Structures are given as structure tokens and as C-alpha cells.
Amino acid sequence: MCDRAMTRRAVLGSLGGLGVMGTSGMTGTAQTAATDPAARRAELYALLGQVPPRDRPASGEKLGEASRDGYILETWRLDLNGVEPVPAYVARPRQASGRRPGVIFDHSHGGGYAIGKREFIEGRSYLQPTPYAKELTDLGYVAICIDHWVFGERSHTSEADMFKAMLWRGQVLWGMMVYDSLRATDLFLQRDDVDPARIATLGMSMGSTMAWWLAALDERIKVTVDINCLTDFQALLDRKALSLHGVYYYVPALLTHFTAAQINALIAPRAHLGLAGLRDKLTPVEGLDRIDRELQQVYAAHGHPERWSLLRYDVEHQETAEGRKAIVAFLQRFL
């Protein structure tokens, strides 16, 4: 793994050297895919573009740790994708022993390209005052947050430039983000203080979208909490509101294979809590209605209607105090 900071030119140039992962998920019949969750996951993964091989070696180097507000914060540099290092934080309870539940925290966008994983320890204006690193460690959990492509210490290249450079090479920015989340999960579950049978993922806005994509693709995720970005794609199209989401959000040909509800159905019957603002333009209410209706049917068919819940609040794009309490209660119940 490279020890020096990657330059914009070096990263853009090295993207073309990625290996292509062969998949068979899109070769089956539509009927088979519709009734076989494994086939549907393979189909969804295939839409992520030319990501590195899923089984390429991944590793991490611990750079240090410090005591912070009742927990221990570890700083890591991960080798996940073979293109550029991935900075990460891991927060663990100060007084804890044995294996603990683990949470993959997915940071938001909000135009804060320089922020990235710092949201985990510092919070954001649209989140409740207690940062999630403290909230989760106070619950006795171990949690990880990485800098995603074009954010935090990886903000050397603009979102638009990275999206276009990847597109030229058959890659998808969102696909590379999801890939990094999957590989970070691989490493996180190898920790001696993490119980691999008790893993959750949680995020706000872009982090919300990452949470439900990650859980849809990775059955090791037992609990999903998505805050304010359970967007129905057709509702967004109908409102002509595509510009409200960053370009990172758009995956070629996605709508010819999946609706948002169909992606989220791959999480069932695992526990899933969605939270939404009734005045949030990123999640049109009619789209929330559609997703909620379909997922209620899916979870009922699995015999676990209690594992799906969509809570709505009379706010715009923000987490509420009531929502934070509901999130904590949901994690305590299902994780």
C-alpha cells in the first residue's frame, strides 16, 4: 500500500488498470432473478461497473489512537481497491471487553467534500447534536466510518471529474463507493472486538442510500437504518428533480433492472428502519408511500412485519430528536 498521498493525476491515471470482475447475475431469466434473491444481488452488483475483484487482498494499517469524549478513536489507512488508500476511523467503547456489535457508519454528502468521515466524530448541522461515534460507543458498539471517493482526505478530485473519468473507463462512481463499503466491511468483521453476527449499517442522506445498498448486497448486515434518503426513483423522475441528487447517485441502466423498493426488498427479512421528512424534496411523499407499501408486503410475506418500519416527520432534510430516539431503540431491539 502506498504511504504517500495520492495526487489527482495519479488516481485518475490508475483507474484504468482495475481488473474486471466477472459476474453471471445478468445472464439468467428475469423470472429466475425475480424469485431468487441471490441472483438479484448478483444482478445488482453487476450494475456497479468494472469494480476491482471482490476477492482481491485487502488490508489496513493502524496509524494511531486517542481517547475522545468517552471512547477510543482509532485512525486507519486501508487498502481496499488498489487505486488509492482509504482513510478510516474506528470508534470503540473505552471500557469494553469481548466481541461487541459492530456498525458501519456511512457519511453523508451535503456538499461537504472536505468533511467525509469527520461527520462521524463531529456531526453535521442536519444531524442531532451527539455525533454518532459517541452515540454508538455509548451503546457499547464498535463502529467504523471511511472517507468515500471524493470526500474527506480523498477530495483531491471533484465529484464531476471523478464521475466522468470513471465513466470513460466503464466504471461507476457509486459502484466504486459501494465496493469500498463492502471491502471495509470485510476488514471490520475481522476485528477481535467485533461480533460478525451482530452488524448494522447506518447513515444520513448519501449515507442513507449507502446503507440500503450495502445491506441489499451483503447479507452479513443484520440491521439497516437509513435516514432521509429512501428515494423512489420514478417519483424523482415524475417531479423532474434529478438535479437534487449529486451525479454520484446515478448508476447506468439501473431503472431497467430495479426500482428502489426492489433493491430494498433484498434486505428482507433482516431488520430495516427508514426515517424520512415529509417536506424533504429528495424523497417525494408519493415515493415513500410506494416503497412503504411494497416493503410491508415483502416483510409480511417473510413472516416478520415487525422488522420493517418507515417513520415520517414534519421536517425537511434533517434528523429529528424523536428520530434519534427511535434509531437507538431499533438498534437495541434488533442488534
Residue ranges and their predicted role:
Residues 2-19:
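N-terminal secretory signal peptides and thylakoid transit peptides that target proteins
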Residues 5, 10, 25-39:
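C-terminal segment of N-terminal export signals and the immediately downstream linker at the start
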Residues 58-95:
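N-terminal cap/lid segment of alpha/beta-hydrolase-fold proteins
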Residues 99-108:
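Short beta-strand element of the alpha/beta-hydrolase
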Residues 108-179, 237-238:
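Cap/lid segment of the alpha/beta-hydrolase catalytic domain
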Residues 162-205:
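Gly/Ser-rich "nucleophile elbow"/oxyanion-hole loop immediately N-terminal to the catalytic nucleophile
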Residues 223-264, 269, 282-292, 300-304:
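Mobile cap/lid helix-loop segments that gate and shape the active-site cleft of serine hydrolases
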Residues 293, 298-335:
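C-terminal catalytic histidine-bearing segment of alpha/beta-hydrolase fold enzymes
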